[in-house]
Design a protein with these regions (language model features):
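Extracytoplasmic beta-rich repeat domains
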Residues: 288-310, 337-352, 375-392, 401, ...
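Active-site environment of divalent metal-dependent phosphoester hydrolases
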Residues: 39-42, 72-78, 99-107, 138-141, ...
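N-terminal active-site segment of His-dependent metallophosphoesterases
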Residues: 20-81, 159
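Binuclear metal-dependent phosphoesterase catalytic core
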Residues: 202, 209-276
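His/acidic metal-ligating clusters that form di-metal
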Residues: 56-63, 131, 141-210
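Short loop/turn segments that connect beta-strands within beta-propeller blades
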Residues: 329-333, 369-372, 409-413, 450-454, ...
Length: 626
């Protein structure tokens, strides 16, 4: 009898022990959906719907992660629609934005945060901390750049917890400040990274940090699906779940890894760049200094910058993406005043007769007293105003996201005329002269309006139907009765300024970046693949084409002329100077981030170049002494 009792209690003990072990070994189970690319009328809608229904059919998930690119074009309507679909999930979900949600955002990246309620998250489940943030690039075509606000947030997080980081992009050279990101992630205690962007499954490692990139929910002529992640105390598995009609299948894990703390093994130079940094480094500045290039001053803003300058006499004005307009001294860069507004600012301000004009994502066009920063007048649009204004003959010409191009009185903001039939939103600075107003939109179209009454003169449309191929980011230039524009189909188009007729196309010479010489005789354009081309504006022949040595580059920033120099900006914080015959003279690095529109002028002290980069760096160069 005692033997029976002993056997019984041993059995009970083993049973309870096994239950305890099982409880400890029960993993977190997470559904990860990424790259949804919601677009009304496309197959993406049914793909998302099927994935959401399937997630809801699973009985044992802990929560859902959404990895960005939830929309195809970042419109307000797309964001609202996909939010409605995701809200039908029966599990809690946490979301980050992707480049498609940010780059083509008609709201200036405001709507995503307003609709979903946050731009980053931080929560803990079963001993694991999950953090996620947006990746950029905000509004400008470039590699990803975690915004300064996101970097400040990462820097504020305390370490000491096992952490999983969720971001749309791989944290490699796809992200301009990748080395700052991974350094912070290691400090925090990150052990695993989850992302998307590539639309397919990949095992990754970022300076010792393990991670995965996962498939898109899109069927892509195959089957929709998503990812199941299981996370134990020190181990992770990643599996694809594919939806075959009414028969979903979760495949065996394609990724399995033990997770542990990762120490930083990277070495950094005095400028904070890692030893493996693959692009132009700051040592080019030493070479340029020997050729008479001097950095007069340089400082770091506490926010990103995604627009250019207005400058007059001894002052310059610029805006940050956090919504602050600043006035600084050109002598030493010291701040004279700053004012903060109700939305992000991507508009390059314009100065005229003591008035500073710019657009804001809060939907207003503002005119300030340039000396003091006080508001003289403001005019409301029904959506964000991301475009840059031009002033001519006491009138302000500016596009917006609400389908209306406006001409306003500089003095009081009263409406002179409106053109209310614009398709797509406007982000560019228009070309304006006494004959026409020319601007592009994110609906494949380029418009020419009469500057006196706003009547339509002509519309040109890109032959490629995707709205990604729009003449919208380029700042058009004009010479010899011709309009020159660059389109993301990698072509430079030359149009008759009077009729809009296409006169010539230069293939594979550019993406969105053009410029023009001071005398108007030469048009410059920059390709994605390290070439700079000079075109005779009258004869439409190529004068020269040179290798730039800058590698892959997708910056939309206009090429500038500084005296007899051609200044080519890049998306990696560098400028490269050429003479007017195409000879490379020198280069300068300001930061790792995209160079914004530049301002140049000559004085008795020499030629000057005012530059900012997207990470908030602002600097003034003097090129020679006279």
């Amino acid at each position: 009898m005692d033997r029976i009792k002993t056997t019984f209690f041993i059995a009970i003990f083993l049973s309870l022990a096994s239950v305890g072990v099982f409880a400890q070994e029960t993993p977190l189970k997470i559904a990860f959906l990424t790259d949804l690319h919601y677009s009304e009328g496309s197959v993406s809608v049914s793909d998302i719907s099927r994935c959401v229904r399937d997630v809801n059919s699973l009985p044992d998930l802990d929560f859902v992660l959404i990895g960005g690119d939830v929309t195809d074009f970042g419109t307000d309507e797309e964001i609202e629609a996909v939010k409605s679909m995701l809200d039908s999930l029966r599990y809690s979900y946490y979301i980050v934005a992707g480049n498609h949600d940010a780059k083509w955002s008609e709201s200036g990246c405001d709507t995503f945060g307003k609709v979903f309620g946050y731009d980053h998250f931080d929560f803990t489940r079963k001993g694991w901390r999950f953090i996620g943030c947006n990746c950029g690039p905000d509004m400008r075509m470039a590699p990803a750049l975690l915004p300064k606000e996101s970097m400040d947030w990462l820097g504020s997080l305390e370490g000491g917890q096992k952490t999983v980081f969720i971001n749309h992009y791989p944290q490699d050279t796809s992200v301009l400040n990748y080395f700052d990101v991974t350094r912070e992630l290691k400090r925090i205690g990150t052990r695993f990274l989850i992302g998307g962007h590539w639309h397919s499954n990949h095992a990754m490692e970022y300076d010792g940090l393990p991670g995965v990139l996962c498939r898109s929910t899109l069927s892509a002529r195959k089957n929709p699906g998503y990812t199941i992640i299981k996370l134990w105390d020190d181990h992770v598995t990643v599996s694809e779940r594919r939806l075959y009609g009414s028969t979903p299948i979760t495949f065996e894990p394609w990724y399995s890894k033990d997770l542990k703390a990762v120490e930083s093994g990277e070495e950094y130079d005095s400028e904070g760049l890692p030893s493996g940094y693959p692009w132009m480094r700051y040592d080019v500045n030493e070479d340029a200094s020997m050729k008479g290039i001097t950095q007069v001053w340089k400082f770091q803003e506490d926010s990103n910058i995604a627009s250019g300058f207005a400058a007059w006499k001894d002052k310059a004005w610029y805006a940050t993406t956090s919504g602050t307009v600043c006035c600084v001294s050109l002598k030493d860069g010291s701040r004279i005043w700053s004012e903060t507004f109700g939305g992000r600012i991507f508009s390059t301000p314009v100065y005229c007769d003591g008035i500073l004009v710019f657009g804001c994502a809060d939907g207003f066009i503002y005119a300030l007293d340039a000396k003091r920063g006080s508001v003289i007048w403001c005019r409301k649009a029904s959506k964000s105003v991301l475009a840059s204004p031009v002033v001519m003959d006491g009138k302000v010409f500016v596009g917006s996201s609400d389908g209306i191009f406006r001409c306003l009185s500089l003095k009081d903001g009263d409406t002179v005329w409106e053109y209310p039939q614009v398709e797509g939103f406007v982000e560019c600075r228009p070309y304006v002269d006494e004959d026409q107003v020319v601007f592009g939109t994110w609906a494949n179209k380029l418009y020419s309006l009469d500057p006196d009454d706003g009547s339509l003169q002509w519309v040109w449309k890109c032959a490629k139907t995707s709205r990604m191929y729009s003449p919208a980011a380029v700042w058009p230039v004009k010479s010899h009765g011709k309009i020159f524009i660059a389109v993301p189909d990698r072509c430079l188009y030359v149009l008759d300024a009077v009729t809009g007729e296409e006169l010539k196309r230069f293939d594979k010479t550019c993406r969105e970046s053009v410029g023009i010489s001071p005398d108007g005789e030469t048009v410059y354009c920059k390709s994605m693949w390290h070439t700079l081309t000079a075109i005779d504006a009258k004869s439409l022949t190529i004068k020269w084409q040179v290798e730039t040595g800058t590698g892959y580059d997708i910056s939309p920033t206009s090429i500038a002329s500084a005296g007899d120099l051609v200044i080519m900006p890049t998306d990696k914080g560098n400028i490269v100077a050429f003479d007017t015959f195409g000879s490379k003279l020198w280069a300068w690095k300001f930061s790792p981030a995209l160079v914004n529109p530049m301002t140049t002028w000559r004085s008795s002290e020499g030629q000057f170049l005012l530059v900012s980069t997207m990470d908030g760096t602002v600097a003034l160069l003097r090129i020679g002494n006279n």
